[in-house]
C-alpha cells in the first residue's frame, strides 16, 4: 500500500503551502479512478511535488463475480467497466494534458489480464472489461503518439499479495476446484494452495507474483523497450489457453 511504501522509503520534505506532506522517494495520494476531477487533482499534486511526471502505470481494477444463477446486476457491470476500462481512459486523457505541457516523452502502462482472451464461466463482466482494456492499449498508443508510448501488462491470476483474494474468496475458490483444506488452516497456507493450483495449469508451473508483474512494468517504462508501443506483455507463466490465434 501507499502507507507501507512511504513508511519504508520516507516522504522527504513537503511543498510549502501546497497541502502535500511529502515529495521524497514516494508519496501516497488518494483518487477515484472513475472521477475525472479526482484524477486531475491527483496528477496536479504529483506534478507539483516532483516537477512533472514521466511514466504512469494504472493498476486499479475490480472483479465482481456473477451470482449463483450466473447473473450480474447492471450497477456491478457498470462499476466493473467504470474502473477497468473508463478509469484507465480518464487517467490517460488527463495525463496526456500534462505530458503535452511538459513537451517531454512519456510512458503509460495499463493492466489488463490473461482473461481478456480466455472466455470462461463466472467472470463475464471482468473478462469483457479486460478485453476492452486490451484494445484500449492499442487505441491510446495511436491517439497519444508520438509523444507517449502506451502498452499493457496482462498477468494471469495473482493470488499471493493480491487484495482481490481475501480469505473468503480463497476458500470459495478452493471449494470450487475441490482442493482439500481445513476451516482452521492459516490464510497463508490456503493462498499457497490456490496459487499453486493456478500455477499447475501453466507451462512453467510457477505462481505469478506481484514482483513478476513489476519486472514487466519496469521494462515498459524504461528505455529498454523504447521502440515498443501498442503491445500487451503477458505475465502468465505460459497459459496456453491464452495463446493468441
Model-derived features: where do they sit?
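Substrate-binding pocket helix/loop in short-chain dehydrogenase/reductase
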Residues: 67-69, 73-79, 198
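Residue(s) in the substrate-gating loop at a strand-loop-helix junction
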Residues: 113
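Short, small/polar-rich loop/turn modules that mediate ligand/substrate recognition or access, typified
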Residues: 145-149, 228-230
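Active-site loop-to-helix junction immediately N-terminal to the catalytic Tyr of the SDR YXXXK motif
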Residues: 72, 119-127, 139
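The beta1-alpha1 cofactor-binding region of Rossmann-like NAD(H)/NADP(H)-dependent oxidoreductases
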Residues: 30-41, 74, 211-212
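Active-site helix of classical SDR
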Residues: 92, 129, 137
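Short C-terminal tail/terminal secondary-structure segment
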Residues: 63-66, 217-218, 229-245
Amino acid at each position: 500500500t501507499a502507507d507501507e511504501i512511504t513508511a519504508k522509503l520516507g516522504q522527504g520534505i513537503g511543498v510549502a503551502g501546497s497541502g502535500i506532506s511529502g515529495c521524497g522517494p514516494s508519496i501516497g495520494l488518494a483518487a477515484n479512478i472513475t472521477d475525472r476531477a479526482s484524477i486531475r487533482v491527483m496528477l496536479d499534486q504529483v506534478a507539483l511535488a516532483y516537477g512533472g511526471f514521466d511514466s504512469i502505470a494504472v493498476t486499479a481494477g475490480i472483479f465482481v463475480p456473477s451470482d449463483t444463477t450466473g447473473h450480474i446486476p447492471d450497477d456491478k457491470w457498470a462499476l466493473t467497466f467504470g474502473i477497468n476500462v473508463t478509469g484507465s481512459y480518464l487517467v490517460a486523457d488527463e495525463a496526456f494534458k500534462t505530458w503535452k505541457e511538459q513537451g517531454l516523452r512519456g510512458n503509460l502502462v495499463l493492466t489488463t489480464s490473461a482473461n481478456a482472451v480466455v472466455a470462461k464461466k463466472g467472470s463475464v463482466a471482468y473478462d469483457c472489461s479486460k478485453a476492452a482494456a486490451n484494445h484500449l492499449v492499442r487505441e491510446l498508443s495511436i491517439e497519444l503518439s508520438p509523444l507517449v508510448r502506451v502498452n499493457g501488462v496482462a498477468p494471469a491470476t495473482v493470488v499471493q499479495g493480491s487484495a482481490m483474494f481475501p480469505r473468503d474468496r480463497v476458500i470459495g475458490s478452493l471449494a470450487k476446484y475441490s482442493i482439500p483444506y481445513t476451516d482452521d488452516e492459516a490464510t497463508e497456507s490456503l493462498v499457497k494452495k490456490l496459487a499453486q493450483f493456478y500455477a499447475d495449469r501453466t507451462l512453467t508451473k510457477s505462481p505469478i507474483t506481484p514482483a513478476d508483474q513489476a519486472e514487466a512494468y519496469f521494462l515498459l517504462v524504461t528505455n529498454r523497450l523504447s521502440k515498443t508501443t501498442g503491445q500487451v506483455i503477458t505475465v502468465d507463466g505460459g497459459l496456453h489457453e491464452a495463446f493468441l490465434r
